[in-house]
Every structure is written in structure tokens, then in C-alpha cells.
């Protein structure tokens, strides 16, 4: 089973990576840092856009772990952009059955902020027929989710 961790933090060694490490510990996985890719906003088309490269890597994975810091009361812009751009690009069954996990961390998030992120990722999974396993916001939750990975 192949696992892809998509790091939506601009910090490659930050808290999002550390929290994801609790979920991914002992597993073989590939990591994709969104900060390394040019992914333009929905509706913009440029020759150097690398969005489809990310989608192809997602297609190859059996399980996807999506990680984001909580910035300005929500998920990072790079993660939001990835989700937004997916609409109309992913064929109906391309992601069907893939497991999706969400790692979401911040300094002192409110329950409303966490619920909004969880809802958004859960709806994304539902739209594409993915098996949403849930969200981890701390080490204990990440280790519990790891049982399903």
C-alpha cells in the first residue's frame, strides 16, 4: 500500500511535519511539499502550473495524508488551493476508495476552526468517493488514526 503525505505548510520542518510524523511513524511513505510546486488559483492558467503533477501523485497513492497548519482561522492557502483546483479535474471514480487523513495543527485553535477544516476535508473526500478516516490535531489523535493507515 502506498502512502502520500502532502505537506501544506511552507515550513518543511515545522509542527505540521512533526504531527504527521506521529501518524506516519513506522510506515513507508512519500512526501510532497506543496511549497515546492507552482499551483495557481482556480481559474488561472499558466504554462508553468504544476497542479496536475500533484494530482498524478495523488492518483498513484492508496492513502493520502493531508497536512496543514491553521493560519488565519483556517487551513493554509496552499491546501485550500489544492482542494479548490481539484473541482472539475478529477474524474468521478479516480480517487474512489482511497483513504484520506487530515493532520491539522495550530497554536491555540478554537473548536469552530477545527470543525471547519474537518468539514471541508470530509466534504472533499465525499465528493470524490474517498474513505475519510478523520482529523488529527494532536499526538494522541494522530497515533489513534495511525491504526487505520
Could you tell me what each predicted segment is?
Residues 1-91, 122, 126-133, 137-149:
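N-terminal beta1-alpha1-beta2 submodule of the flavodoxin-like/Rossmannoid cofactor-binding fold
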Residues 96-135:
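Short, glycine-/small-residue-rich phosphate/pyrophosphate-handling segment
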Amino acid at each position: 500500500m502506498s502512502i502520500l503525505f502532502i505537506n501544506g505548510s511552507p515550513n518543511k520542518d515545522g509542527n505540521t511535519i512533526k504531527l504527521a510524523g506521529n501518524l506516519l511513524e513506522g510506515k513507508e511513505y512519500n512526501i510532497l511539499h506543496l511549497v515546492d510546486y507552482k499551483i495557481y488559483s482556480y481559474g488561472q492558467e499558466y504554462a508553468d502550473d504544476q497542479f496536475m503533477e500533484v494530482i498524478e501523485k495523488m492518483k498513484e497513492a492508496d492513502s493520502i495524508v493531508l497536512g496543514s497548519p491553521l493560519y488565519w482561522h483556517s487551513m493554509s492557502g496552499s491546501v485550500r488551493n489544492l482542494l479548490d483546483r481539484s473541482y472539475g479535474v478529477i474524474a468521478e471514480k479516480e480517487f474512489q476508495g482511497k483513504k484520506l487523513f487530515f493532520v491539522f495543527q495550530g497554536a491555540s485553535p478554537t473548536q469552530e476552526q477545527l470543525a471547519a477544516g474537518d468539514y471541508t476535508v470530509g466534504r472533499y473526500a465525499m465528493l470524490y468517493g474517498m474513505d475519510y478516516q478523520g482529523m488529527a490535531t494532536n499526538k494522541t489523535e494522530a497515533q489513534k488514526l495511525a491504526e487505520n493507515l
